[in-house]
């Protein structure tokens, strides 16, 4: 998986940036606020999430790991794909989104194009306990705040597992072994998911 990119910015468009790293130009989808920090011809570093589908591999870029983790958490909501997750992060910054979820502010969530009242209510129900309070760097309390969680979930999603499935397996592994490393947690989560098939 590609977790971050550093290199020269070749192009900045409305919804993506092209960054050259080791002679290869990578197209990275990003929010307008992230794109506003990038200038053509300068060096940049983005934290990324790589989403692998049957017919595509897409990179999504973020200014920090916290926002990337929030993006991956949004993908766990039924009916929320990468485009809708990016739209949500385009309308709300990480703290604003955390606050809206903590307060159950359906009106704030429906400002996102593509999210209606039902979708906003579902987001509140499914994410309220997974996302920490506004101002918190942890994406969720206890097990979900484990530093190993995000890379393991990202790797599982990259291998084709549903985000919700990946999160549940990872949380189960980390609840049983609080000292797990990224590689040991990934192996254990894959083992769990293999038994479930």
Swiss-Prot record:
Residues 139-143 are annotated as: Flexible linker. Homotetramer. Forms an RuvA(8)-RuvB(12)-Holliday junction (HJ) complex. HJ DNA is sandwiched between 2 RuvA tetramers; dsDNA enters through RuvA and exits via RuvB. An RuvB hexamer assembles on each DNA strand where it exits the tetramer. Each RuvB hexamer is contacted by two RuvA subunits (via domain III) on 2 adjacent RuvB subunits; this complex drives branch migration. In the full resolvosome a probable DNA-RuvA(4)-RuvB(12)-RuvC(2) complex forms which resolves the HJ. Residues 64-139 are annotated as: Domain II. GO terms for cellular component: cytoplasm; Holliday junction helicase complex; Holliday junction resolvase complex. SUPFAM superfamilies: DNA helicase RuvA subunit, C-terminal domain, Nucleic acid-binding proteins, RuvA domain 2-like. It comes from the Bacteria. The RuvA-RuvB-RuvC complex processes Holliday junction (HJ) DNA during genetic recombination and DNA repair, while the RuvA-RuvB complex plays an important role in the rescue of blocked DNA replication forks via replication fork reversal (RFR). RuvA specifically binds to HJ cruciform DNA, conferring on it an open structure. The RuvB hexamer acts as an ATP-dependent pump, pulling dsDNA into and through the RuvAB complex. HJ branch migration allows RuvC to scan DNA until it finds its consensus sequence, where it cleaves and resolves the cruciform DNA. The gene is ruvA. InterPro entries: DNA_helicase_Holl-junc_RuvA_I, NA-bd_OB-fold, RuvA, RuvA_2-like, RuvA_C, RuvA_C_sf. Disulfide bonds: none annotated. Pfam families: HHH_5 (PF14520), RuvA_C (PF07499), RuvA_N (PF01330). CDD domains: UBA_RuvA_C. Keywords: Cytoplasm, DNA damage, DNA recombination, DNA repair, DNA-binding. Belongs to the RuvA family. GO terms for molecular function: ATP binding; four-way junction DNA binding; four-way junction helicase activity. GO terms for biological process: DNA recombination; DNA repair. This is Holliday junction branch migration complex subunit RuvA. Residues 144-197 are annotated as: Domain III. Residues 1-63 are annotated as: Domain I. Has three domains with a flexible linker between the domains II and III and assumes an 'L' shape. Domain III is highly mobile and contacts RuvB. The keyword DNA repair applies.
